[in-house]
């Protein structure tokens, strides 16, 4: 359930 949230957080961090 939290896997998607972690992935999104990582993508967001990389996008920054």
UniProtKB/Swiss-Prot annotation:
Disulfide bond residue pairs: none
Modification note: The proteolytic processing to yield cerebellin seems to occur either prior to the secretion by presynaptic neurons and subsequent oligomerization or in some other location after release of the mature protein.
Alphabetical keyword list: Cell membrane, Disulfide bond, Glycoprotein, Membrane, Postsynaptic cell membrane, Secreted, Sialic acid, Synapse
Keyword Protease: no
Domain C1q: 1-16
Taxonomy, superkingdom: Eukaryota
Gene Ontology, cellular component aspect: extracellular region; postsynaptic membrane
Main localization, broad class: secreted
Location of this chain's protein in the cell: Secreted; Postsynaptic cell membrane
Tissue localization of expression: Localized in the Purkinje cells. Cerebellin and [des-Ser1]-cerebellin are equally abundant.
GO terms of biological process kind: maintenance of synapse structure; negative regulation of inhibitory synapse assembly; synapse organization
Subunit structure of this chain's protein: Homohexamer; disulfide-linked homotrimers. The trimers are assembled via the globular C1q domains. The trimers associate via N-terminal cysteine residues to form disulfide-linked hexamers. May form oligomers with CBLN2, CBLN3 and CBLN4 prior to secretion. Once secreted, does not interact with other CBLN family members. Interacts with GRID1. Interacts with NRXN1 and NRXN2 long (alpha) and short (beta) isoforms produced by alternative promoter usage. Competes with NLGN1 for NRXN1-binding. Weakly interacts with NRXN3 short isoform and not at all with NRXN3 long isoform.
UniProt function note: Required for synapse integrity and synaptic plasticity. During cerebellar synapse formation, essential for the matching and maintenance of pre- and post-synaptic elements at parallel fiber-Purkinje cell synapses, the establishment of the proper pattern of climbing fiber-Purkinje cell innervation, and induction of long-term depression at parallel fiber-Purkinje cell synapses. Plays a role as a synaptic organizer that acts bidirectionally on both pre- and post-synaptic components. The cerebellin peptide exerts neuromodulatory functions. Directly stimulates norepinephrine release via the adenylate cyclase/PKA-dependent signaling pathway; and indirectly enhances adrenocortical secretion in vivo, through a paracrine mechanism involving medullary catecholamine release.
Protein name per its UniProtKB record: Cerebellin-1
Upper taxonomic lineage: Eukaryota, Metazoa, Chordata, Craniata, Vertebrata
